[in-house]
């Protein structure tokens, strides 16, 4: 485990900007080019890991805000980034302007296509297969037989050296004017793109309705429409969407491994998507 002395900051120099599942964001009161993300109390290694990965991702040429210092306010730890002024996430944009949903979905799909066509240094990042295999071992809610089937599915996925965001959903993609950025890259790696696309599908068809409303600022039906506009642009219009969904759904179900770990209990809604793997 890497250690690094965190720079002490005065939170009075920052103003609240928003929050997500892992922490709270702030903007610097006196420097408009600096923003801060502080993780929940007790999380130290996670923000350090995110900073290190974000720096590697930035240096690899992936469009993402430039990371700065590892910091603490005395209770929480986090990272300073270059602030992208006037930026909007695709989730917020769809929630505020659903009449532009198709355009936003198409732009996000093109971002994802470019990301998944980007070759990366495989010595610098974790293979997505290795990540899921490791997390599967740590999940206490699957039987040994279920773990065997899931592991076989994971390992049978094609091998590629192209970029994987790791938490690919439209709240983690920003735009301002013609510029586009990915954020929250703590799980960045490389591998088969459907491990990523499964998350986009999950936000439409698997995530709990209240979670969609809170995290993505839209009604569940709107998230379904977003997926239906996204899929033909990402996969091409020559494939029926039902065939696309049949291929993607098991990868969406793999999020069960992570969600159950975080929630500390089995998640039947997510497990439903694993039926093609567990009960072929």
Question: Where do the protein language model's features map onto the residues?
Answer:
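An alpha-helical support segment within catalytic cores of ATP-dependent transferases
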Residues: 1-5, 117-166, 170-171, 176
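Regulatory N- and C-terminal appendages and interdomain linkers associated
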Residues: 1-7, 265-280
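Conserved N-terminal boundary motif of the eukaryotic protein kinase catalytic domain
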Residues: 8-16
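ATP-binding pocket architecture of kinase catalytic cores
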Residues: 15-121
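Hydrophobic "anchor" residues on beta-strands that sit immediately upstream
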Residues: 33, 78, 161-163, 180, ...
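Catalytic activation segment of kinase domains across protein kinase-like and atypical kinase folds
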Residues: 171-197
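Active-site activation/catalytic loop segments of kinase-like enzymes and analogous catalytic loops
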Residues: 197-238, 252-268
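Short, surface-exposed acidic
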Residues: 237-248
């Amino acid at each position: 485990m890497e250690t690094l002395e965190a720079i002490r900051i005065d939170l009075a120099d920052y103003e609240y900007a928003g929050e997500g599942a892992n922490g709270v964001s702030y903007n610097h009161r006196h420097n408009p080019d600096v923003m801060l993300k502080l993780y929940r109390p007790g999380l130290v290694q996670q923000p350090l890991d995110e900073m290190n990965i974000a720096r590697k991702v930035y240096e690899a040429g992936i469009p993402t805000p430039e990371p700065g210092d590892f910091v603490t306010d005395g209770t929480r730890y986090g990272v300073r980034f270059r602030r992208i002024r006037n930026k909007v996430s695709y989730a917020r944009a769809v929630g505020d302007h659903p009449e532009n949903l198709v355009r936003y979905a198409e732009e996000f799909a093109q971002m994802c296509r470019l990301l998944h066509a980007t070759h990366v240094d495989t010595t610098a990042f974790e293979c997505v297969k290795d990540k899921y295999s490791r997390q599967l071992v740590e999940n206490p809610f699957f039987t040994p037989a279920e773990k065997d089937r899931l592991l076989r599915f994971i390992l049978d996925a094609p091998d590629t050296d192209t970029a994987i965001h790791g938490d690919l959903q439209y709240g983690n993609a920003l735009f301002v004017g013609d510029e586009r950025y990915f954020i929250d890259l703590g799980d960045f790696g490389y591998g088969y793109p459907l491990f990523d696309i499964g998350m986009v599908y999950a936000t439409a068809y698997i995530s709990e309705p209240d979670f969609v409303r809170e995290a993505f600022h839209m009604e569940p039906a709107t998230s379904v429409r977003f997926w239906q506009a996204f899929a033909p642009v990402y996969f091409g219009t020559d494939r029926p969407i039902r065939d696309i969904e049949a291929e993607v759904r098991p990868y969406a179900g793999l999020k069960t491994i992570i969600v159950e770990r975080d929630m500390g209990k089995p998640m039947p809604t997510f497990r439903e998507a694993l039926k093609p793997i567990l009960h072929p």
